[in-house]
């Protein structure tokens, strides 16, 4: 089983969860929640400008740096 990352916030998506959206040009976007899906597809928001996305990405990078330093 493969674990994908959310195209909007970067969270891991466990198998059997999330939304897979295929654009007309063939690009596959995977979302962990409806919140991410609506923010990107329906409202066209930029994830870099969303405070909650920045918070998730910072926590993810901090966890990765701790695990790589061991």
UniProtKB/Swiss-Prot annotation:
Binds 1 zinc ion per subunit. Disulfide bonds: none annotated. Keywords: Metal-binding, Ribonucleoprotein, Ribosomal protein, RNA-binding, rRNA-binding, Zinc, Zinc-finger. CDD domains: Ribosomal_L24e_L24. It comes from the Archaea. One of its GO terms (biological process) is translation. Coiled coil: none annotated. Zn(2+) binds at residues 6, 9, 32, 36. GO terms for cellular component: ribonucleoprotein complex; ribosome. GO terms for molecular function: rRNA binding; structural constituent of ribosome; zinc ion binding. Its cofactor is Zn(2+). A zinc finger (C4-type) spans 6-36. Binds to the 23S rRNA. Part of the 50S ribosomal subunit. Forms a cluster with proteins L3 and L14. This is Large ribosomal subunit protein eL24. It comes from Caldivirga maquilingensis (strain ATCC 700844 / DSM 13496 / JCM 10307 / IC-167). The lineage of its organism: Archaea, Thermoproteota, Thermoprotei, Thermoproteales, Thermoproteaceae.
